[in-house]
Amino acid sequence: MCSIVEDDFGDEGGAHAMKEDTPQPELGGNELCRKCNTEQAVLKLNQKEPQCRVCFLNYVRHKFRASLGSTKIVRRGSRVLIILTGEPANVTLLDMVRFGLEQDAFKQLRIVPVLLYVDDDFVGNTSEARLQQLAERLQVFKQFESFPAYYTVCGSSRHVALTFDGAFSPAGFEQDEARLLQVLDAVRSVSSKQDLLEQVRKQTYRQIGHALQCAYVFLSDIGVDLAKTLLSNVALGRGCSLAQDVAFCDDRYNTVKLVRPIRDLNPDEVSNYLQYSEQPLLSYSPAKHFEDKPSLQNLTAKFIDNLMQSFPSTVSTVYRTGDKLDAPKAARNECCRFCGAALDYRGSKTLFATEYSRLVSSRINAACSHEDILLKSKQMELDAERAVNGEDDQGEERVLMKQLCHGCRNIFEDLNK
């Protein structure tokens, strides 16, 4: 066994070799801002110089504007659908958009914002709890009532105008809600439930965006969210769409593109922005669906949150790994029917090994002789290869599986037939 640098690894693997980020010195009592050298500093971010309130707000807003300007993806005058959640990062994004629209002609943000709230609180909640959460969210959304806003439920292709006068009621979507709840109830594992809900949510963004004639959808994902997404998608078998799921722009559908303009922000910058903004900003942080149950996504989120406490600079390294990946290009008929990712199953050795193992478990038993095993193994290899490539003719199920990527296949196979 190799013993090179064996002292670096003990019973804890290489964990003890990683050094925690050095705590930054706290802000002095009368320390001046290192940017303008005139105003008193009010905060000091990790690995940054002390800043006053104005310089800090300019710094965060510049990161937002620079991400839009450097990519040149969002065209001037475009209608942009901004997804409402009410969470701190979402409120930060909305306030920066509002601030950009209020600037003079030279610095003005030239987009036409349209807000959309996609309601999925009917999942796992009583009607009373759902209405209570909606009322709390509306108080947060009311801060941006100058923008046109719409309401829909997850999985629906319909939308209605959203009002903030307290009389709004989510009626008329009962069939859409019942259909999604029926599908979720049929899924066995929590990991597949969460993955299914996320994919349906993205489909809803694109459908409503297309209906409202918005070519772009702004999401309020920040760096730590994308780090969780990246590692979760690896575990879920969504490697083919990994680059697009954490990229600045997800353009797998050319008609409506998902844009993440504040992906470079971290939780400290978001919380300080809400604290030091020109006017008080409310936010809402509800519990996520299935958050208290074991799943691949929840385990990954817990790992990233713990990493953020001791090694915050490592989190950005995790999600920026996605920038080094390229999404495979495929024709429209070579994309997953459910999530739109390029189909990745043909010739996959990993899927072949999984399918072959399944066939061995179902066809080989203790009563089989050595000759029978050798004879069956050749046939199982052929059957496994045909199953992976979707070349076996076994009814409508296989026809559908042939049109799904590996990640979506896992959801389908997790359904109670």
From Swiss-Prot:
GO molecular function, a single term: nucleotidyltransferase activity
Pfam families, per database record: CTU2
Composition skew (Acidic residues), residue ranges: 1-11
One Gene Ontology biological process: tRNA wobble uridine modification
Cited InterPro entries: CTU2 (IPR019407), Rossmann-like_a/b/a_fold (IPR014729)
Gene3D superfamilies: HUPs
Keyword set, alphabetical order: Cytoplasm, tRNA processing
GO CC terms, sorted: cytosol
Compartments in which it is found: Cytoplasm
Primary location group: cytoplasm
Taxonomy, superkingdom: Eukaryota
Pathway: tRNA modification; 5-methoxycarbonylmethyl-2-thiouridine-tRNA biosynthesis
Skewed-composition ranges (Basic and acidic residues): 13-22
Region Disordered, residue ranges: 1-24
Task of the protein: Plays a central role in 2-thiolation of mcm(5)S(2)U at tRNA wobble positions of tRNA(Lys), tRNA(Glu) and tRNA(Gln). May act by forming a heterodimer with NCS6/CTU1 that ligates sulfur from thiocarboxylated URM1 onto the uridine of tRNAs at wobble position.
UniProt record similarity statement: Belongs to the CTU2/NCS2 family.
UniProt protein name: Cytoplasmic tRNA 2-thiolation protein 2
Species of provenance: Anopheles gambiae (African malaria mosquito)
